[in-house]
């Protein structure tokens, strides 16, 4: 299945649920305590990250979605730290402060990228607190397309059935990250996303794939869910709906360092994708890819749009790693520049990739951190090179280029010159191979006007696509 990202900036999502602060104490350990057989950790780093429903909201914001966040907190310094954490990414929280309860905090002690212990500071909120939170959140339903209920069984989501019914009556999809063995509380939800242990806590042990599907469909019928997405760790995800065949999506994680917050990432990517107009199967594939990225990070983390673009290109793209649309590339460049990366760009037909091309692209990449290759599409090559060209279709040309270690992104263009796309992307450095003069290079004036540079690189003598084609024809 070809997977592309929808316009996340159009997504409007409300997250309601158990917010918490994930606090990390980090340091080296080199000895055992004389008081007890436990390691001594010398703390040299303290970090606070929004967790639970707050992490869901931050994931949505990081992807580019518009998000509102509602949750229960205490009247303490932890609540202030949590507020600052979400505001840092542009999320304005709608807290309900409960004076006699602490803001939920999970403190983790880490050494050498390993979690040694977790300490929880919490008291469950009362039912009336949850009722007030859900009532307060009703006023926000008219301004969103999707609601996420992030339930960690801490009291914020006690009995949301009326809230779900109201949201659905307004045409708002309701996604639930469930907790506990009573799924009747989520009756009528659009989609629930239990992991395998949460699923089995409700339906009992799953003995086979057929058994999983039968039990999932039983829940659909019993609680009037539109769909169930069971996340299955190394086995990927299984989507079950009432009126379509099941969909199994294999895992895409390459390395797993920490599963903290992986469920948050799944439901946030689902919500953002659906709110942006994606079909359910597409949204699930995006969420699966996002989860594969986040488990490769340590601690509660988010996934950026550029990370998702690259991971999708690697795992789902039909043209190989690095092949992106112009819009995807424009966003990727914004992120690259925010990270302080120097972006180099070149262009060409690259009809038959040869040693001269490879050497040239390697030189170009050495001049910066990222290399973009803009490729003439088939119609453009035919106009420039004549009948019989291109030898290779644009998808194949881009796939070969994307396989080179020196190339980060490959993007097609349809005009005879790349002036328009260069003027839009404005790399830090525009390079061209051959005997061009800088003032004659398409797009060069625009790059220089924007403060960038233009440079001419040499090609290896005696190697060209035309010469290769002529040599092949002479031997026939």
UniProtKB/Swiss-Prot annotation:
Pathway: Nucleotide-sugar biosynthesis; ADP-L-glycero-beta-D-manno-heptose biosynthesis; ADP-L-glycero-beta-D-manno-heptose from D-glycero-beta-D-manno-heptose 7-phosphate: step 1/4; Nucleotide-sugar biosynthesis; ADP-L-glycero-beta-D-manno-heptose biosynthesis; ADP-L-glycero-beta-D-manno-heptose from D-glycero-beta-D-manno-heptose 7-phosphate: step 3/4. GO terms for biological process: ADP-L-glycero-beta-D-manno-heptose biosynthetic process. Keywords: ATP-binding, Carbohydrate metabolism, Kinase, Multifunctional enzyme, Nucleotide-binding, Nucleotidyltransferase, Transferase. Pfam families: CTP_transf_like, PfkB. ATP binds at residues 195-198. Residues 1-319 are annotated as: Ribokinase. It catalyses: D-glycero-beta-D-manno-heptose 7-phosphate + ATP = D-glycero-beta-D-manno-heptose 1,7-bisphosphate + ADP + H(+); D-glycero-beta-D-manno-heptose 1-phosphate + ATP + H(+) = ADP-D-glycero-beta-D-manno-heptose + diphosphate. CDD domains: RfaE_like. The keyword Hydrolase does not apply. The active site is at 264. It comes from the Bacteria. Its EC number is 2.7.1.167, 2.7.7.70. One of its GO terms (molecular function) is phosphotransferase activity, alcohol group as acceptor. Residues 345-476 are annotated as: Cytidylyltransferase. One of its GO terms (cellular component) is cytosol. Homodimer. In the N-terminal section; belongs to the carbohydrate kinase PfkB family. In the C-terminal section; belongs to the cytidylyltransferase family. Catalyzes the ADP transfer from ATP to D-glycero-beta-D-manno-heptose 1-phosphate, yielding ADP-D-glycero-beta-D-manno-heptose. PANTHER family: BIFUNCTIONAL PROTEIN HLDE. This is Bifunctional protein HldE. It comes from Shewanella oneidensis (strain ATCC 700550 / JCM 31522 / CIP 106686 / LMG 19005 / NCIMB 14063 / MR-1).
């Amino acid at each position: 299945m070809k997977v592309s990202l929808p316009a996340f900036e159009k997504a409007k999502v409300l997250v309601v649920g158990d917010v918490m602060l994930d606090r990390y104490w980090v340091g080296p350990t080199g000895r055992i305590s004389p008081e007890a057989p436990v390691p001594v950790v010398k703390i040299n780093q303290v970090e606070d990250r929004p967790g639970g429903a707050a992490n869901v909201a931050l994931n949505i914001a990081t992807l580019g979605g518009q998000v509102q966040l509602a949750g229960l907190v205490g009247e303490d310094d932890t609540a202030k730290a949590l507020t600052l954490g979400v505001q840092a990414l542009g999320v304005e929280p709608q807290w309900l402060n409960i004076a006699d309860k602490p803001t939920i905090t999970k403190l983790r002690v880490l050494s050498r990228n390993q979690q040694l212990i977790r300490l929880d500071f919490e008291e469950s909120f009362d039912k009336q607190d949850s009722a007030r939170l859900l009532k307060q959140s009703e006023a926000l339903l008219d301004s969103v397309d999707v609601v996420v209920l992030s339930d960690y069984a801490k009291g914020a989501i006690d009995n949301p059935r009326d809230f779900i019914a109201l949201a659905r009556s307004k045409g708002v999809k309701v996604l639930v990250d469930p907790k506990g063995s009573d799924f009747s509380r989520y009756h009528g939800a659009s989609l629930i996303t239990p992991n395998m242990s949460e699923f089995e806590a409700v339906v009992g042990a799953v003995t086979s794939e057929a058994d999983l599907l039968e039990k999932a469909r039983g829940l659909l019928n019993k609680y009037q869910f539109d769909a169930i997405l069971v996340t299955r760790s190394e086995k990927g995800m299984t989507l079950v709906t009432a009126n379509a065949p099941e969909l199994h999506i294999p895992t895409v994680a390459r390395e797993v360092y920490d599963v903290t917050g992986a469920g948050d990432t799944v439901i946030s990517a689902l919500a953002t994708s659906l709110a942006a107009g994606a079909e359910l199967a597409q949204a699930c594939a995006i969420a699966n890819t996002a989860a594969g990225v986040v488990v490769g990070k340590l601690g509660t983390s988010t996934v950026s749009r550029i990370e998702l673009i690259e991971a999708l290109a690697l795992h789902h793209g039909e043209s190989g790693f690095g092949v992106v649309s112009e819009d995807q590339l424009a966003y990727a460049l914004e992120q690259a520049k925010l990270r302080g990366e120097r972006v180099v760009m070149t262009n060409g037909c690259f009809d038959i990739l040869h040693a001269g091309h490879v050497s040239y692209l390697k030189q170009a990449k050495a001049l910066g951190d990222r290399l973009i290759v803009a490729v003439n599409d088939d119609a453009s090559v035919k106009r420039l090179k004549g009948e019989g060209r291109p030898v290779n279709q644009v998808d194949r040309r881009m796939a070969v280029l994307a396989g080179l270690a020196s190339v980060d992104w490959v993007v097609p263009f349809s005009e005879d010159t790349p002036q328009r796309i260069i003027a839009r992307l404005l790399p830090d450095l525009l390079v061209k191979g051959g005997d061009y003069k800088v003032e004659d290079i398409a797009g060069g004036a625009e790059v220089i006007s924007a403060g960038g540079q233009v440079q001419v690189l040499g090609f290896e003598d005696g190697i060209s696509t035309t010469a290769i084609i002529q040599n092949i024809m002479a031997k026939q």
